[in-house]
A protein has these predicted regions:
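A short, N-terminal "cap"/entry segment at the start of jelly-roll beta-barrel domains
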Residues: 2-56, 128-194
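Short histidine-centered beta-strand/loop micro-motifs
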Residues: 60-67, 84, 91, 110-111, ...
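Short, conserved beta-strand element in jelly-roll/cupin
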Residues: 51-55, 64-82, 121-124, 190-194, ...
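Conserved, short, structured surface segments that act as functional micro-motifs
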Residues: 110-112, 117-121
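Conserved hydrophobic/aromatic beta-strand scaffold that supports enzyme active sites
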Residues: 34-36, 48-50, 72, 90, ...
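Short acidic-glycine-tyrosine-enriched beta hairpin
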Residues: 37, 84-105, 221-230
């Protein structure tokens, strides 16, 4: 049985979540700690989690896959060793780098540094995770151009990226290449300011998610009090 992925209609809202809010850490799969960044999940359309592994070392994970529409892993602090179907030998995901896990690509978390933290985004919020007891990784086939449900695996490395003007004046960004390789299912940019202030702007995305990695900023939303983020 392999039910289709159902993408719920997004229930749009303006949400700000701070680490200082003392949201609880929940112990989840393979002993990882999870903190929910979008509690209402916009009607089930998205889940965003802040994940940490306090004690580094081998991770008791198994080869598995997710039945999703989109999934991002962004390494915020530390590093983690991962292995993916058809992508060759294991890779080390360093802070500032990210991968997308295309729908149903088999993968496994192998080893983590102390106090690693990642941001994981999944669409939709509720999706099925399946253990693959038959596959061993790395597998013999290497096909880095393979598409999984129309999406290609992406491993974005900060040191190889180029900074360019962002769509919002006053910022520059590095494009991860995710939009191109998912056929615009999602896009991911890392941005930084060139100026202290930017003009009012808007977007036409279904969902826009921002995460402040370092520094601080003031976010003003229409009809909202300004939020200081850090």
């Amino acid at each position: 049985i392999n039910p289709p992925v159902v993408l719920p209609t997004t229930k749009h809202s303006f949400v700000v979540k701070k680490l200082a809010d003392q949201a609880p850490w929940i112990i989840g799969r393979a002993g990882m700690h999870y903190r929910d960044l979008i509690p209402d999940r916009l009607g089930g359309s998205i889940i965003a989690s802040h994940i940490r592994i306090p004690d580094g070392g081998p991770v008791p994970d198994m080869v598995h896959y997710h039945s999703v529409g989109f999934q991002l892993i962004f390494c915020y602090k530390g590093w983690v060793d991962l292995v993916y179907e058809d992508q060759g030998e294991p890779l080390r995901l360093h802070a500032g780098n990210c991968v997308i896990q295309p729908p149903e690509i088999r993968h496994q978390v192998l080893y983590a540094s102390d106090n690693i933290e990642v941001i994981e985004i999944g669409v939709p919020a509720d999706h099925i995770t399946t253990i693959d007891h038959k596959m061993e990784l790395p597998n013999k086939t290497v096909n880095k151009n393979r598409r999984f449900k129309g999406q290609k695996f992406v491993h974005h490395k900060a040191e190889e990226a180029q900074w360019e003007k962002f769509r919002v004046p006053g910022f520059i960004s590095r494009d991860t290449g995710i939009a191109k390789n998912t056929k615009n299912v999602a896009g991911v940019h890392i941005i930084r300011p060139e100026k202290n202030k930017s003009p009012e702007t808007y977007h036409d995305s279904d969902i826009l998610f921002n995460f402040v990695m370092e520094g601080n900023m003031i976010l003003s939303g229409e009809g909202k009090e300004p939020f200081k983020l850090s």
